[in-house]
Amino acid sequence: MAQLTNNDEKYRDLLFEILAHGLITDPEVKRSLAKFFIFVGDGGNGKGTLLSIIRSILNRENCSGLKIKQMSDERYAYSLDGKLVNLGDDIQDQPINGKDMEMLKNISTCDYVEIRKMFKNSTSAAMTTSLIFTSNHILKSWEKGESYKRRVLWLPMYSKPKRKDPRFITKLTTQKALEYWLRLIIEGYKRLYENGDFTN
């Protein structure tokens, strides 16, 4: 985590709060926070590694992997229902259109969205899924208002490891390591409830 945050203690706290955000299933609490998250930076700096670690901590069954453009399709959106987090890796460098932006905002505020299981009629659902994405670029939006800026948390990741370890993820997801991660995430969870906001 020191590598990912450049040894910035407040940034480290923020990252654990973001992971803790995925454990919050109370719509009122999630609505009050009203955020989605985009890790941004060029390749080889650990963005994909972080998503792999999150999947290991929260269990793959609790995670989906939709891109932003897929989410506004009610057939894909169905896969978000009941998940703790959506982990969308390597989002394309294209402006977010109005339809996709509406979906991002609705899910981040636990508003009702339309979802549809294959061969079934669509239905409305309010989801508490946390939305976490990675991108090599700052994504623009067609939206002219301020609500996009209020909803998104940009998380820069520009430092690269000096030496690559092929077993890095395995080492960080042992049972002992996962227990350590979980303890720090719980601390972040408590901070979110106590402060009602993320660490600046």
Where are these predicted regions, by residue range?
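Feature primarily recognizes SF3-like P-loop helicase cores of small DNA viruses
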Residues: 1-200
